[in-house]
């Protein structure tokens, strides 16, 4: 879906797009939907990694999957970036084993941008590493700080550690040790942050272990979806509320766009040697287009 729009963006932004997957299925789907794929490269990859497959399958039984072939293409210089909506565990495994980590980085991490009252906040890690060591969290803070500075243009970004309280002594052993290491790091570490403060303009980078980070990002998405449904329900109550809805329709569309994670593109995998980005398995065509624009 959306290949036609992707192609328009390719021409506009001078991006060369290579679709990696079953050539037969890609061409058949394009033909059935009357979509021109002229000018878009196709790299044949017959295997498929499902969401049920083990992460290690990308290096073993599924080494001819679109994910494996695409990452090899990136590693060999045949591509400049790789974008996937596939199995998260397999993508992390493949990025680590095929593309390789940046020298000195212990573990790569998912790092999505999320909306806040003013601008966006980067969350790192949002699920790549369920169990973390303190030094990993320190590296996450450094990588997140560099990204927000160099890529997002936020000078001296504020880095905070996700915790159960703002006091220095809060949290378990991991948080205590990570707090001390983050204080020593060459970044603007502002201390602990509670989840309720993340949507406000309290920090620019949120550091978390993958378990905590994944809960934060999924809760973010769930609350946004539930809130929009509730607002719609309230506006549809009666004639007066429907009239009120008509008066603020433009504003509501802006709010919906602000709350929709599809409008924030893909999450880069920090810590690998070349750009690898992950988007939702349920991502819409617009999400891919936005991600391509970010890559360019």
List the model feature ranges, each with a label.
Residues 2-7:
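Short, small-residue-biased leader/transition segments that mark boundaries at the very start
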Residues 10-13, 31-38, 152-153, 182-187:
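Short helix-capping segments at alpha-helix termini
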Residues 14-16, 151-159, 189-196, 237-246, ...:
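Flexible, glycine/charged-enriched surface loops at secondary-structure junctions
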Residues 18, 24, 131-195:
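Glycine-rich phosphate/diphosphate-binding loop of Rossmann-like nucleotide-binding domains
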Residues 35-78:
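Phosphate/nucleotide-donor binding subsite
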Residues 87-136:
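Glycine/threonine-rich beta-strand-loop-alpha-helix active-site module
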Residues 99-107, 116-123, 202-206, 210-292, ...:
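Glycine-rich phosphate/nucleotide-binding loop
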């Amino acid at each position: 879906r959306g290949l036609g729009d992707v192609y328009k963006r390719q021409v506009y932004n001078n991006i060369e797009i290579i679709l990696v997957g079953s050539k037969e299925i890609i061409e058949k789907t394009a033909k059935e939907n009357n979509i021109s794929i002229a000018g878009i490269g196709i790299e044949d990859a017959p295997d498929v990694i499902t969401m049920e497959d083990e992460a290690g399958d990308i290096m073993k039984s599924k080494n001819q999957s679109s994910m494996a072939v695409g990452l090899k293409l990136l590693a060999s210089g045949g591509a400049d970036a790789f974008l996937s909506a596939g199995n998260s565990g397999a993508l992390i495994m493949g990025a680590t084993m095929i593309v390789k980590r940046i020298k000195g980085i212990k573990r790569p991490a998912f790092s999505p941008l999320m909306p806040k009252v003013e601008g966006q906040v980067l969350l790192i890690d949002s699920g790549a590493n369920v169990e973390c060591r303190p030094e990993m969290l320190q590296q996450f803070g450094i990588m997140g700080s560099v990204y927000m500075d160099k890529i997002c243009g936020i000078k001296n970004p504020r880095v905070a550690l996700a915790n159960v309280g703002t006091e220095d002594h809060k949290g378990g052993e991991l948080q205590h040790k990570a707090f001390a290491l983050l204080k020593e790091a060459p970044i603007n570490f502002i201390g602990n942050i509670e989840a309720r403060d993340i949507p406000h303009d309290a920090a620019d980078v949120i550091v978390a272990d993958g378990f905590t980070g994944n809960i934060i990002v999924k809760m973010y998405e769930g609350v946004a979806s539930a809130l929009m449904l509730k607002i719609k329900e309230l506006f549809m109550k009666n004639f007066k509320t429907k009239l009120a809805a008509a008066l603020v329709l433009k504003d509501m569309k802006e709010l919906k766009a602000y709350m929709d994670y599809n409008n924030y593109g893909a999450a880069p995998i920090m810590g690998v040697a070349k750009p690898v980005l992950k988007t939702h398995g349920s991502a819409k065509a617009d999400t891919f287009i936005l991600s391509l624009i970010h890559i360019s």
